[in-house]
Amino acid sequence: MTSTLPSQPKDMELANSSRPSVHGRFGRFGGQYVPETLMPALAELEKKAAEAWQDSSFTNELSHLLKTYVGRATPLYEAKRLSQHYMSREGGPRIWLKREDLNHTGAHKINNALGQALLAIRMGKKRIIAETGAGQHGVATATVCARFGLECVIYMGQEDMERQALNVFRMKLLGAKVQSVTAGTATLKDATSEAIRDWVTNVESTHYILGSVAGPHPYPMLVRDFHSVIGEETKQQCKEAFGRSPDVLLACVGGGSNAMGLFHSFIEDLSVKMIGVEAAGDGVNTKRHAATITQGSVGVLHGAMSLLLQDSDGQVQEAHSISAGLDYPGVGPEHSYLNEIGRAEYVAVTDKEALNALELVSKLEGIIPALETAHAFAWLDTLCPSLAPGTEIVINCSGRGDKDVNTVAKKMGFEI
């Protein structure tokens, strides 16, 4: 199901997306809806981040670690058998994968965790907290804390801990304390709420490495900027591979960090169609989904105004997805803005469609994608028949599926 797109965005609207207003807003979305206790910490974070980006010692260290520790640049891989699968008599698109699954820790999340850890050190913060759903951001945060000798506490919903037991052990092995959250739905929303409570209590000694382009300003901008290396590399790699920008960008969207990292470098290039794929769960016509943009309304969650899943009284509703990383009733404010001005299109696919796509990609390409990433692959069934032959598609392969094997096996009727 797609959202209705308004007329083509104006140059000014696109420029507004590059950097939010002084009040941290993308259009009407964003802002800082937080306790007064956190305002100095947010101001310090914005100031230190701005200074860091102008400091060559910071950018050089970040670039060096992205290369030698994370393993960047990640390759742009031509998925020939997947492309062949969608070929018709007239031809078909060519499908490329931006291989963020090949990063150290197995997903895009470490780009942001590494950058924020370096910022925390600059601010003199020795204790790090983070929230996690699928566990990938938790693992990435625990990894960089081990690298720099920082205390690490990860908040994770009890349901997600059961779904992602392997990642829970990885975090503990890396020296992190994993704090179970049993409140509410015991998933990502509740883990985020608990992390924010911790931060309010320990703001002087603690830095919160928020894992998505959500939350109060400057986090949506900060997380996006650390992930923008994805799109920067993709733009250059596309020129080398086929001499121009891609026609279509595809990425899954929960909070939206991997999608924003891919989209950011292409926002002002209107020849590039950008599609974010949300989780439709059991179907958007049911109450068990996480299709925030395609089904949500404007509200405030975790410090920012954005599109949310909420009832008529403004109470945030439970989200559902087979993917723990997409199981979130909100979305980053910049995604809400890009949807509102018509620069990006947002669609949704079901659990079943994502599982089918995961199996298809595994068998055709020898790559087992994360369940989150599988949602982006699933949209190819709808997208490809409408495309002209020779269309160049780039899918952000945001993470590998090792963490999801137990979940997938159970759904397919296998005992492990």
From Swiss-Prot:
The keyword Transport does not apply. Keywords: Amino-acid biosynthesis, Aromatic amino acid biosynthesis, Lyase, Pyridoxal phosphate, Tryptophan biosynthesis. The keyword Lyase applies. CDD domains: Trp-synth_B. GO terms for molecular function: tryptophan synthase activity. Residues 1-23 are annotated as: Disordered. It catalyses: (1S,2R)-1-C-(indol-3-yl)glycerol 3-phosphate + L-serine = D-glyceraldehyde 3-phosphate + L-tryptophan + H2O. The modification N6-(pyridoxal phosphate)lysine is found at K109. InterPro entries: Trp_synth_b_CS, Trp_synth_beta, Trp_synth_beta/beta-like, TrpB-like_PALP, TrpB-like_PALP_sf. Its EC number is 4.2.1.20. Its cofactor is pyridoxal 5'-phosphate. One of its GO terms (cellular component) is cytoplasm. NCBIfam families: trpB (TIGR00263). Belongs to the TrpB family. The beta subunit is responsible for the synthesis of L-tryptophan from indole and L-serine. Tetramer of two alpha and two beta chains. This is Tryptophan synthase beta chain. It comes from Prochlorococcus marinus (strain MIT 9211).
